[in-house]
Regions:
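Active-site-adjacent structural elements that line small-molecule/cofactor binding pockets in enzymes
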Residues: 1-340
């Protein structure tokens, strides 16, 4: 572990819609508590119809006014369904009101029936989601860097689009120009791919990360740290080949976990939670691949293993009804093991 580890919490902005004891006010309070407990960042997810949750940019705006230090991130924003000009304007505003604390985690959208239906409802062709995603990030990044963009793509054609009309003091820009962007890649989250397919998927994923982002956001299979090592090795090699410093690439892992007094009780609670939260995915993915479940020591051992594989930022999603209790226990009993 050469880099200092950073710990964030995903506040689980879907939970207030399914758990009456964790309403939206409690979620905002928890963001403040996370800052007080020593977390480095707080994160929210994004899903409009597939798994409905409170809208992430609005939530982070509210959190920005109640916190001073923690970074504010999305894990992750489904950029393929967002208008790139609006995304740039909204994110620049968030970065300004938070005084430059944002991290934009972005993904294309998973290949699930419910996600396909979401694209259909929004009038977007699911088959084009990768192209829509890439063009969205290219355009938004340019607007958040220079305040203007010209772009001639497959899905977007923009000429002299600018956040400056000539009457303002200057273009509408974020504090960070641009804010850091983490690109999601989980090329091996499902089994059954041949070695050639895996290699091709990994090559494309690394290329996309380097073209569009400043780092890699993943939720690779939790029993396979070698998958992180393998993709990170490819990512670092490709970065060097393109003249970028590999050490400047952030590697963030969003991990779903559950801390219990014993492994048996923790697993039972976690299984029930995942089945209710992810009814489709829970049927096809091994429960053990979601993340570490067990005692404080077991959770810490898992983090150490993946830190050695190259992860420098852990975004913790707690698979439990008691979000605040899990967050506090992790901060007080797990995080000190990794602090100087």
């Amino acid at each position: 572990m050469t880099k200092p580890l950073h710990f964030g919490m995903n506040l689980n902005n879907r939970e207030p819609l399914i758990a009456p004891q964790y309403d939206i006010a409690a979620m905002l309070d928890l963001a403040v508590e996370c800052e007080e407990l020593g977390y480095d960042s707080v994160w929210v997810g994004d899903s409009l119809l597939s798994r409905p949750r409170w809208e992430p940019i609005n939530l982070l705006s509210a959190i920005s006014q109640r916190t001073d230090r923690v970074k504010l991130g999305t894990a992750c924003m489904v950029a393929s369904v967002r208008n790139p000009i609006w995304l740039a304007a909204e994110w620049a505003t968030l970065d300004q009101i938070s005084k430059g604390r944002t991290i934009l985690g972005v993904g294309v959208g998973s290949n699930e029936p419910s996600v396909r239906r979401e694209f259909e409802a929004l009038g977007l062709p699911f088959a084009n989601r990768i192209g829509l995603f890439e063009e969205c990030i290219e355009i938004a990044r340019q607007l958040m860097t220079d305040g203007k963009v010209n772009f001639d793509g497959v899905h977007h054609h923009l000429e002299d689009v600018s956040f400056y009309s000539g009457t303002e003091l200057g273009p509408m820009l974020p504090v960070q120009r641009p804010p850091p962007i983490l690109v999601v890649s989980n090329p091996r989250i499902k089994e059954g791919f041949s070695a050639d397919v895996i290699a091709a998927r990994m090559e494309k994923a690394c290329d996309r990360i380097l073209r569009l982002g400043d780092g890699w956001l993943t939720c690779c299979r939790a029993k396979h740290p070698e998958e992180v090592s393998e993709q990170l090795s490819s990512l670092r090699r490709m970065a060097s080949d393109r003249g970028r410093d590999p050490d400047n690439l952030s590697v963030a892992y969003q991990v779903t976990m559950h801390i219990g007094d014993s492994t048996v009780t923790a697993n039972a609670d976690f299984e029930e939670y995942i089945a209710s939260y992810y009814p489709e995915l829970s049927k096809i993915l091994d429960l053990a691949e979601w993340g570490p479940v067990g005692t404080v020591e077991e959770i810490g051992d898992w983090i150490e293993t993946f830190a050695r594989a190259g992860v420098d930022t852990f975004i913790c999603r707690f698979g439990a009804a008691d979000q605040a209790g899990q967050a506090e226990r992790f901060a007080r009993e797990v995080m000190p093991r990794f602090r100087d």
